[in-house]
């Protein structure tokens, strides 16, 4: 069974943290800078990419000490708007890749907490591929059921 994650904004460090639910005492947070818009260098992705956590459908950068590419990208505070409908997140992320206004940090936090991880872990929806492509992530998924081509998935 796949682990569940909780998503919390840490205003003191200005990061969005991901933690396994029910593992607060033993799990380290996965966090990413809210101001970083570029994908990390290959060295930012550790060789032990956390497959032991059984997190279905997350790319290897989710276990980077710098945090997941898409969360770092989609949490940039300097690109804010009132858009809050989670159904159009891929379009919102595409606008961000073009440097246009997009979803607010609060809306993104709610989306990741209430929708995205539920879709990934409970429903296995393929929207995760599109989210990470448009969010600037080019890392492979961990425990993906079949080979996937990010560039044709979007």
From Swiss-Prot:
Primary localisation category: host cell
Region called Mitochondrial targeting sequence, residue ranges: 68-117
Q: Which UniProt keywords apply?
A: Activation of host NF-kappa-B by virus, Activator, Apoptosis, Host cytoplasm, Host G2/M cell cycle arrest by virus, Host mitochondrion, Host nucleus, Host-virus interaction, Modulation of host cell cycle by virus, Transcription, Transcription regulation
Q: Signal sequence: where?
A: none
Single Gene Ontology BP annotation: symbiont-mediated activation of host NF-kappaB cascade
Give a Gene Ontology cellular component term annotated to this protein. Answer: host cell mitochondrion
- Among the Pfam families in the record, one is X
Post-translational modification as stated in the protein's UniProt record: A fraction may be phosphorylated in insect cells and HepG2 cells, a human hepatoblastoma cell line. Phosphorylated in vitro by host protein kinase C or mitogen-activated protein kinase. N-acetylated in insect cells.
Q: Which family does it belong to?
A: Belongs to the orthohepadnavirus protein X family.
Q: How does it assemble?
A: May form homodimer. May interact with host CEBPA, CFLAR, CREB1, DDB1, E4F1, HBXIP, HSPD1/HSP60, NFKBIA, POLR2E and SMAD4. Interacts with host SMC5-SMC6 complex and induces its degradation. Interacts with host TRPC4AP; leading to prevent ubiquitination of TRPC4AP. Interacts with host PLSCR1; this interaction promotes ubiquitination and degradation of HBx and impairs HBx-mediated cell proliferation.
Q: What this chain does, per the record?
A: Multifunctional protein that plays a role in silencing host antiviral defenses and promoting viral transcription. Does not seem to be essential for HBV infection. May be directly involved in development of cirrhosis and liver cancer (hepatocellular carcinoma). Most of cytosolic activities involve modulation of cytosolic calcium. The effect on apoptosis is controversial depending on the cell types in which the studies have been conducted. May induce apoptosis by localizing in mitochondria and causing loss of mitochondrial membrane potential.
Entries under HAMAP family matching the protein: HBV_X (MF_04074)
This protein is called: Protein X
């Amino acid at each position: 069974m796949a682990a569940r994650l909780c998503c919390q904004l840490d205003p003191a460090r200005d990061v969005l943290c991901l933690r396994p639910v029910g593992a607060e005492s033993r799990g380290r947070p996965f966090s990413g800078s809210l101001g970083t818009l570029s994908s990390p260098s290959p060295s930012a992705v550790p060789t032990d990419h956390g497959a032991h956590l059984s997190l279905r459908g997350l790319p290897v950068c989710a276990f980077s000490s710098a945090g997941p590419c898409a969360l770092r990208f989609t949490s940039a505070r300097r690109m804010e708007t009132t858009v809050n409908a989670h159904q159009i997140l891929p379009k919102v992320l595409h606008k961000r890749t073009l440097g246009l206004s997009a979803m607010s940090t609060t809306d993104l936090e709610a989306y990741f907490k209430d929708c995205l991880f539920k879709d990934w872990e409970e429903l296995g929806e393929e929207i995760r591929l599109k989210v990470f492509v448009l969010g600037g992530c080019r890392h492979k998924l961990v425990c993906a059921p079949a080979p996937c081509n990010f560039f044709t998935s979007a």
